């Protein structure tokens, strides 16, 4: 089994399911008392979020690249960045850390393609929904077209993520709002929906979505398990 290095804490609410799902995957594959060989560097999300708001992406790239190098020195054999949004600085991490980097959009793209879909809704932070680092990768590498919510919906989705989900608050009102947005995007022709923020799966259970769900945290964790046992 390879040792996986997790870059977490963005937010820590969604890092917990990563750890659980990876261990469950290892136990399911190997049985008995087997558990995952994991190294975790959990950052202070306050600092990361402030850099996001100020547009200081180079600084966040430096922070995460240094964290990845620390995991490499500690014995990690691959890196998993436990957040969608911070894949905006994936190139900064990959350029300085020589370990295999398991990109969350690649794992998600393979899952969508495997389901025979080419047109999906994308929910996430405003950075993930509006910028090209995520949607562009899905389009260029997997020919997947992403539908995003309207501007006012994107603002509210983003607000709920940062002011509720990242603080461990999961309300029925927000759950219903996300379900409403998903239903509207289904009417526009979306075949499935990407939960493109690792906290969204903590809020919206699959049965509340009218579309098949691609929960990126679960998909990414499964990708990590496959890598560890390869």
UniProtKB/Swiss-Prot annotation:
The UniProt keyword set, sorted, is: Isomerase
Pfam families annotated for this entry?
Asp_Glu_race (PF01177)
InterPro entries for this protein? Asp/Glu/hydantoin_racemase (IPR015942), Asp/Glu_race (IPR001920), Asp/Glu_racemase_AS_1 (IPR018187), Asp/Glu_racemase_AS_2 (IPR033134), Asp_race (IPR004380)
Lineage, top-rank taxon, reads Bacteria
Reactions catalysed, as given in the entry: L-glutamate = D-glutamate; L-aspartate = D-aspartate
For substrate, which residues are the binding ones?
10, 52, 83-85, 198-199
- Known EC number(s)? 5.1.1.13, 5.1.1.3
Q: Which GO terms describe its molecular function?
A: aspartate racemase activity; glutamate racemase activity; identical protein binding
List the catalytic residues.
83 (proton donor), 197 (proton acceptor)
Per its database record, what is this protein's job?
Exhibits racemase activity for both L-glutamate and L-aspartate, but has threefold higher activity for L-glutamate than L-aspartate. Cannot use D-glutamate or D-aspartate as substrate.
Family the entry assigns: Belongs to the aspartate/glutamate racemases family.
Subunit (UniProt): Homodimer.
Tell me the protein's name. L-aspartate/glutamate-specific racemase
Biological source species: Escherichia coli (strain B / BL21-DE3)
């Amino acid at each position: 089994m390879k040792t996986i290095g997790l870059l977490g804490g963005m937010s820590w609410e969604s890092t917990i399911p990563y750890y659980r799902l990876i261990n469950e995957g290892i136990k399911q594959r190997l049985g008995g008392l087997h558990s995952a060989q994991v190294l975790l560097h959990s950052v202070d999300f306050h600092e990361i979020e402030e850099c996001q708001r100020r547009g200081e992406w180079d600084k966040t790239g430096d922070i995460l690249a240094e964290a990845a190098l620390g995991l490499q020195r500690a014995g990690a054999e691959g890196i998993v960045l436990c957040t969608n949004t911070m894949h905006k600085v994936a190139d900064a991490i990959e350029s300085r850390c020589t370990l295999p980097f398991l990109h969350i959009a690649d794992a998600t793209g393979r899952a969508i393609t495997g389901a025979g879909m080419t047109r999906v809704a994308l929910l996430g932070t405003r950075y993930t929904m509006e910028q090209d680092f995520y949607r562009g990768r899905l389009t260029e590498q997997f020919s997947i077209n992403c539908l995003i919510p309207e501007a006012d919906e994107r603002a509210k989705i983003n607000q709920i993520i940062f002011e509720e989900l990242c603080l461990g608050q999961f309300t029925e009102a927000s759950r219903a709002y996300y379900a409403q947005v998903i239903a509207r995007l289904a009417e526009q022709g979306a075949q499935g929906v990407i939960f493109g923020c690792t906290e969204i799966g903590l809020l919206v259970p699959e049965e509340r979505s009218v579309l098949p769900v691609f929960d990126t945290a679960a998909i990414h964790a499964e990708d990590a398990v496959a890598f560890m046992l390869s």
